[in-house]
């Protein structure tokens, strides 16, 4: 039994997936969007909704959440069907269509599939401390939903990559006390962010705790009181008063069932034709960070371009007897789907 019939199934409700809804709608094609998360936005919303983004055309600065909100608003005229909290598990190929089956047993009939899954289904790498679960989502968080939550608080950031460095810079503006714990003195972040960190360290806006790692969390009923850190060289221990802990050790991601679909994979990315974004399988496309080809640049705007190319190629599948006469959106307006 088929639950939904649509033109394109989009796998992934991140920025590229949402923009695909708009691009397909501009070509009078409908979309059904599947995402394993329970909200629209992918990693942008789940991990860093307030993180500033600087390389979106016409926006000198925009937060990840604002970007998602704008993309959702832009795609609204095309009334997409979102299937959230579901995973696309199986694909069945027929002469004129595909069937997509989710882990909930939902069946969608479509003309084509666009995989816009980013890094795939993901979750944060947990801090290796025995009682970490007792504090998660209470005083230990793997993402920042609202910067205002940390106003005038004592906060510890653990990690040495881009996320840890970027959030240290941002949260130093609002916290009462900010600790940055890392195993090494060097941070793996952009040169510009590194300069900002050095300045904040010098001015005492951030307390640098290196080379240390977190040993123990102390508190009651999910509320942190203290964090014990241990020097990895001398074994010296420090007990620091902390209200919130933000571990940024990256995420673990995988393509899940997509790996079983007979699609050519290289380094956990889907190999595509850069001119059309087709995979090696009939009617299946991939766009955004999940896709790869020689010279690929992993930027959001690259994904937007790939989405447009894939939709234009799929148009000929959905409307085989209707030639595509290209028009600029200024002349065309918003079509009715």
Curated annotation (Swiss-Prot):
Give me the reactions it catalyses.
2 reduced [2Fe-2S]-[ferredoxin] + NADP(+) + H(+) = 2 oxidized [2Fe-2S]-[ferredoxin] + NADPH
Is the keyword Flavoprotein in the record? yes
- Annotated Pfam families: Pyr_redox_2 (PF07992)
Q: Which SUPFAM superfamilies match?
A: FAD/NAD(P)-binding domain (SSF51905)
UniProt cross-references to InterPro entries, sorted A to Z: FAD/NAD-bd_sf (IPR036188), FAD/NAD-binding_dom (IPR023753), Fd--NADP_Rdtase_type_2 (IPR022890), Ferredoxin-NADP_redctase_2 (IPR050097)
Binding note for cofactor: Binds 1 FAD per subunit.
Q: Name one GO molecular function term.
A: NADP binding
Listed Gene3D superfamilies: FAD/NAD(P)-binding domain
The kind of enzyme this is, by top-level EC class, is oxidoreductase
Q: Where does FAD bind?
A: 35, 43, 48, 88, 122, 289, 330
**UniProt keyword NADP, yes or no:** yes
Top-rank taxon: Bacteria
Q: What is this protein called?
A: Ferredoxin--NADP reductase
């Amino acid at each position: 039994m088929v639950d939904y019939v649509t033109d394109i199934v989009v796998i992934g409700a991140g920025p590229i997936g949402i923009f695909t809804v708009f691009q397909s709608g501009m070509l009078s094609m409908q979309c059904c969007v599947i995402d394993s998360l329970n909200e629209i936005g992918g990693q942008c919303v789940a991990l860093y909704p307030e993180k500033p983004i600087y390389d979106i055309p016409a926006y000198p600065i925009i937060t990840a959440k604002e970007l998602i909100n704008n993309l959702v608003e832009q795609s609204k005229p095309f009334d997409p069907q979102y299937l959230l909290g579901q995973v696309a598990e199986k694909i069945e190929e027929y002469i004129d269509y595909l069937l997509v089956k989710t882990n909930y047993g939902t069946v969608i009939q479509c003309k084509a599939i666009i995989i816009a899954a980013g890094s795939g289904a993901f979750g944060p790498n947990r801090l290796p401390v025995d009682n970490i679960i007792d504090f998660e989502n209470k005083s230990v968080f793997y993402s920042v939903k609202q910067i205002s939550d940390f106003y005038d608080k004592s906060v510890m950031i653990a990690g040495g990559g881009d996320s840890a460095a970027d959030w240290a810079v941002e949260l130093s503006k609002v916290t009462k006390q900010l600790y940055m714990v890392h195993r090494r003195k060097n941070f793996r972040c952009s040169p510009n962010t590194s300069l900002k960190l050095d300045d904040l360290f010098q001015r005492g806006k951030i307390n640098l705790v290196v080379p240390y790692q977190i040993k123990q969390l102390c508190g009651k009923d999910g509320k942190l009181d203290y964090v014990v850190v241990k020097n990895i060289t001398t074994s010296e221990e420090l007990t620091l008063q902390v209200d919130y802990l933000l571990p940024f050790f990256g995420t673990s991601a995988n393509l899940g069932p997509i790996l079983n679909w007979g699609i050519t994979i290289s380094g956990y990315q889907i190999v595509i034709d850069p001119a059309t974004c087709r995979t090696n399988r009939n009617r299946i496309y991939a766009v955004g960070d999940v896709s790869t080809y020689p010279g690929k640049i992993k930027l959001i705007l690259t994904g937007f371009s790939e989405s447009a190319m894939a939709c234009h190629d799929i148009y000929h599948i959905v409307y085989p007897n209707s030639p595509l006469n290209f028009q600029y959106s200024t002349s065309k307006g918003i079509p009715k789907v």
